[in-house]
Amino acid sequence: MTLQEEIIRQLGVKASIAPQEEIRKTVDFLKAYLRKHSFLKTYVLGISGGQDSTLAGKLAQMAIAELREETSDQAYQFIAVRLPYGVQADEADAQKALAFIMPDQTLTINIKAAVDGQVEALQAAGVEISDFNKGNIKARQRMISQYAIAGQMAGAVIGTDHAAENITGFFTKFGDGGADILPLFRLNKRQGKALLKVLGADAALYEKVPTADLEDQKPGLTDEVALGVTYQDIDDYLEGKLISKVAQATIEKWWHKGQHKRHLPITIFDDFWK
């Protein structure tokens, strides 16, 4: 088995999908998790205005709405959370995503004071924080807020990790990589886009250029520039297609580099890192 085949197997990616079937499968998955854990009544998800959180949010709201209808339990709620650092440059996109999702509840927590306070505390202790490291603090602070909300509202936190993100390790460890449930896992970027099209999302929500936008000194840095490879190449690779040797080498480099992010903390029994 080639490395490409092994990665595809681990991430569960299909070369082609039926969007309606994947939508139904995901909604049923989200419903089943809450039904199994009767002490949970809510899903919590940060909404950025990008493709991934828009899709995960819409599917979560659909699942919650069906649960309420089927059980007559009004305690089931989907809580969308806006988590800007100061003023978000593409706030209009976030609002467009919320209008599409129509969440039961929307909360806004500005993480700037918490992030800046942490950076200042570290600097006071003599630890200088790089702009890149500060970006990771932002990602982790967003999850702190979401878990605080979930803890108060009998909730589970949804993550937006999908195959095209997982293969490159393009997420912050214990930041956006930390969640309770990953409804998009197995889908690549173009497949997620296909689901949003079927769901009737505004094209602007899935055609916009993906960016994590975590670094102050590199505002709007696109994922593809940061990774050095296009999502088209990543998606093709995940669908078992041939791509250029340069693109393949870049993808596989990120796969190896990000292995630690795909595991729980390492124990003496682990050997994947050796």
From Swiss-Prot:
Entry-linked InterPro entries: NAD/GMP_synthase, NAD_synthase, NH(3)-dep_NAD(+)_synth, Rossmann-like_a/b/a_fold
Residues annotated to bind Mg(2+): 52, 165
Gene3D superfamilies: HUPs
Top-level taxon of the source organism: Bacteria
EC number: 6.3.1.5
Catalysed reaction equations from the record: deamido-NAD(+) + NH4(+) + ATP = AMP + diphosphate + NAD(+) + H(+)
Residues that bind deamido-NAD(+): 140, 173, 180, 260-261
Keywords tagged on the record: ATP-binding, Ligase, Magnesium, Metal-binding, NAD, Nucleotide-binding
Pathway assigned to this chain's UniProt record: Cofactor biosynthesis; NAD(+) biosynthesis; NAD(+) from deamido-NAD(+) (ammonia route): step 1/1
Subunit structure: Homodimer.
Protein family (similarity comment): Belongs to the NAD synthetase family.
UniProt cross-references to NCBIfam families, sorted A to Z: nadE (TIGR00552), PRK00768.1 (NF001979)
Protein name: NH(3)-dependent NAD(+) synthetase
Native organism: Streptococcus pyogenes serotype M2 (strain MGAS10270)
Lineage of source species: Bacteria, Bacillati, Bacillota, Bacilli, Lactobacillales
